[in-house]
Amino acid sequence: KDGSVFLGEITNREGIPNPGHPDHLQKQRILLRIGNRDLYGFDFKWVGEDEIAKREQPKDAYFVERREYGALIGVPVAVKEGDLTLAADSAAARQALPGLIEKAEADRHAVETIEKHEIGDINYRIEKARLEARRLDLVARNEPGRDLSRERAALETTTAEQQALFQAKTVELSTLMEKAGTSFVSFRTAEGGSKELRSLDIYRAYPANELGWFGRLGVYSGRLWEFVSGNPRESNTEGGIFPAIFGTVMMVILMSIVVVPLGVLAALYLREYAKQGALVRTVRIAVNNLAGVPSIVFGVFGLGFFVYFVGGGIDRLFFPEALPTPTFGTGGILWASLTLALLTVPVVIVASEEALAAVPRSMREASLAMGATKFQTILRVVLPAAAPGILTGLILAMARGAGEVAPLMLTGVVKLAPELPLDGFFPFAHLDRKFMHLGFHIYDVGFQSPNVEAAKPMVYTTTIFLLIIVVLLNLTAIIVRNKLREKYKTGAF
């Protein structure tokens, strides 16, 4: 009613209580996502329904997902390729926009391939050559009489080749960026202003008011695939969560590889070998009490022992050429996995002890009567029969480990990891690298984001996906457990 015009989508609706009668609503208001944060300074606005004079659903309005500043909502009015105008009105611009976005996606993929893979690989080799040269300097200092000229010459040749390749790829990238950055789309905003976007910055654009059921399904399918397989952007509030998914799954797998042997060996000793007495009872009580220790305490222990003590020692022994830059002496996925293994090992110990105790005495005696040693009996009879119960402990450990965040904040998780812990360079699994985690991603996006309203969908969707991953990991272990249970089925189970 004041003459303001807004173009956006309704994301929420709530009532405003009457100050005199709190139980009665005075009026209703709606939350509009108007986008265009670079123009307005905000992209969400509350509007009272009694203040609205007229509502329309313009068919030519587009919702544009772009590289930065959130969504842009407007009407395409022109398309330019350098100095050439390809479309000078709204109808022509709408017709040219899909092809332009498709071309921009191909150009963006080519740019990312050169930046992240080709130039990234070259930088990796140059850095390895630099560290090797540094190592040779240390060797020459410790062994003055040793001839290292051949190794130095080979390194200089390798570095020169990689530097030349780097320069060539940089020129290729600049040429591609210059060529791809000449296409622009002009949009008219609700108040009549104009905003020009480079086509390379547009990820998705669609006429929201013209979409039918299949059109909406196509948009949601594209967003879902981008969410699962893409990298985050715009302070993690948009894009995908693939690095967080990968980091979470890899951390849980590493944790499981460590926690199962530790837990089973401890349970075997307590149940099969240790003399039952006051000391063993005390140890069992201590193990049970470990499950109640706050997780942040384990994080502090992991930081002090694994990261600083063990990791620092590894750096001094095996990576002196990289110092003072730490390799293992800083947070990484290995230390995070070991910390969570310590956190969850009491669960595996208790479950494994119960499973070992449930194996019938008759099975042990029959094995011993056949001439088997105690070790053979445990290995061939007791452990297979107790495997379903041990896997139950693993399931509980994975469920707890996948959702922990506090210890990871101290031992290796980061807001954005430029590299995955697994790649094509030897030794392929780089356990010293930092990683992203779905739990920390939820915390970061939900509570550290500069745009809370825009981050809400990412928070809820990531939470659901974390639950799905935990369920899938647990289902896998449950299927294996059930198969083992059927194989070694006895009256004790």
Where are the regions that the model predicts?
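Membrane-topology segments of multi-pass transport proteins
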Residues: 1-236, 492-493
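Membrane-interfacial helix termini and adjacent extracytoplasmic/periplasmic loops
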Residues: 220-239, 274, 298-342, 412-414, ...
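Alpha-helical membrane-interface segments at transmembrane helix boundaries
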Residues: 229, 233, 238-250, 254, ...
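Interhelical loop and adjacent transmembrane-helix boundary motif
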Residues: 235, 411-464
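Transmembrane-helix boundary motif in ABC transporter permease subunits
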Residues: 255-287, 300, 308, 477-486
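Membrane-embedded alpha-helices of multi-pass transport/permease systems
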Residues: 261-266, 297-300, 335, 342-363, ...
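Transmembrane alpha-helices
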Residues: 349-353, 359-360, 374-412
